[in-house]
Every structure is written in C-alpha cells, then in structure tokens.
C-alpha cells in the first residue's frame, strides 16, 4: 500500500503570491543557495538542489512530511539512498533519485531501468537488479531546463521537473508477474549484449523493451529495460507530480 502520509500529494500545493510581485512557494522556509565551494557541481547534484528547494522543502513546510534528509556520503548513495523522507507519525522512506538528465526537455514517454553495465570489462548488475540495496521508492525525474545539455548545468537552469514516485517492490512484483524476474532480466540483458543487438522487444508486453547502449559512446555500456511511464503510473502506490518555482501539482496522467 502507498504510505498514508503521502496521500495528501493528491491535492495540489499551489504557490503563494509574493508581495514583491513574484512567486513565493507555499512551503518556502528560510533557505539560501548553497555555497559554490561546497555544493555538488555535477548535474545530479544540481538537480538535487532544485528538488530540495521546490519539492521536499514544500512538503515539509506543508506538513506532508516531517522532514527530509539528503544523503551526502557516497556509501549511502551506493546502497541506493539519495533522500530519506520521514512521515509525520514516524517511519521513513528511502528514495533513490533517477533522472533522465541526458534527455533534457525531451518529455520522453518512457523511463530506462538499468539491468547491466560494464565495470572494468565485466558485466555487472545494474541498479534495478542489484541485490542488497536499501531503496524503498524510486523518484523518477523528467527534467526541463533553459539548456539542452547537462554539462555545466546549474540548479537555477532547471525550470520544472515531472516526477513519478514509484514503489520498488510494486515494480518488481509486476515484472515478476510478466515472467521478468531478476534472473531472466539479467540473462536476457547479457544475451542482448553478446548478440550485439541495440533493441529487443518483449513478446506479449508492448509497454516495455530492452535497449543496449553503444559501448563506443558510453563507457559503462548499460543494458536497460525501458518501460512506458503510463504503465509505471498505473502500478500500485505510484504517484506523479510536477514541481517548479510556480508550485507543486499532481500529475494523474502522463
């Protein structure tokens, strides 16, 4: 079941008028941009600042969550946790943020889940198939910005994000019900790589297919399972929403 404390997401969180003539977020607590000396200058880090400012901080201020904590240490991130949300009545959710940063402004109707990648020349399970991770939910992000490439992007360049909060267990259960348990996903991803194929459809499953990246373009050469986001939104516990400087609103359809 979806955590009860997140049901209020279904009501829009509007922006409040700024008496100075601009837009002041409903949940804008005292907040200042991080120092350039200390902030993570990677595209992922910059997107994290945007999410902290326009998503998590608003939810905290509105009482939808008690608090949020961004995990800074590399070991925690490698265990599949970027942000921890605490419910008003206690309890926590560990979120793994996944963003399509190399498809800025593309509004793709799908999302790619990593099955395998190359590490020092060896095939290694990707984040969807890796065992032992702490992830409870994925926060899938389709970002929009004033630029089309992630290199050198700043958090102020982002204009909005369309997000899908996805229950990891619900996703894996749905895949297993389609005959795509972890073992089969890994075998088919490895077979796709060995065969040198770039794409392979899945018989009887029009909402998903396999894609292998070109090793000449991407060093890790991931093999992904691509799933239509309309299907992802239909899974139990899934919730879509849009966050921007203008406010936070639900996305009931993609």
What do these predicted regions represent?
Residues 38, 99-153:
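Catalytic cores of nucleic-acid endonucleases
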Residues 81, 93, 136-138:
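Residue-level detector of short, conserved catalytic/binding motifs and their immediate flanks
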Residues 83-85, 91-102:
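Conserved catalytic cores of phosphodiester-cleaving nucleases, focusing on short active-site segments
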Residues 146-254:
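Non-catalytic C-terminal interaction segments of nucleic acid-processing enzymes
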């Amino acid at each position: 079941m979806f955590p009860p404390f997140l049901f209020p997401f279904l009501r829009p969180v509007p922006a409040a008028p700024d008496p100075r003539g601009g837009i002041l977020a409903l949940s804008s607590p005292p907040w200042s941009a991080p120092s350039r000396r200390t902030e993570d200058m990677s595209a992922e880090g910059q997107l994290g600042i945007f999410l902290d400012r326009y998503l998590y901080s608003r939810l905290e201020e509105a009482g939808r969550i008690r608090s949020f904590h961004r995990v800074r240490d590399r070991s925690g991130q490698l265990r599949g946790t970027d942000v921890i949300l605490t419910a008003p009545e206690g309890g926590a959710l560990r979120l793994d943020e996944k963003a399509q940063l190399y498809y800025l402004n593309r509004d793709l109707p799908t999302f790619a889940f990593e099955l395998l990648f190359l590490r020092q020349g060896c095939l290694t399970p990707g984040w969807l198939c890796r065992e032992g991770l702490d992830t409870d939910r994925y926060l899938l992000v389709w970002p929009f910005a004033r630029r089309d490439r992630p290199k050198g992007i700043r958090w102020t360049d982002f204009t909005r994000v369309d997000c899908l909060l996805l229950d990891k267990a619900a996703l894996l259960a749905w895949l297993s019900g389609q005959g795509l348990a972890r073992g089969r996903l890994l075998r088919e991803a490895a077979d796709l790589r060995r065969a040198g194929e770039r794409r392979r459809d899945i018989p009887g499953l029009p909402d998903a297919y396999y894609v292998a990246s070109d090793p000449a373009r991407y060093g890790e050469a991931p093999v992904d399972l691509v799933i239509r986001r309309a299907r992802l939104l239909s899974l139990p516990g899934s919730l879509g929403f849009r966050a921007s400087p203008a406010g936070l609103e639900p996305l009931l359809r993609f």
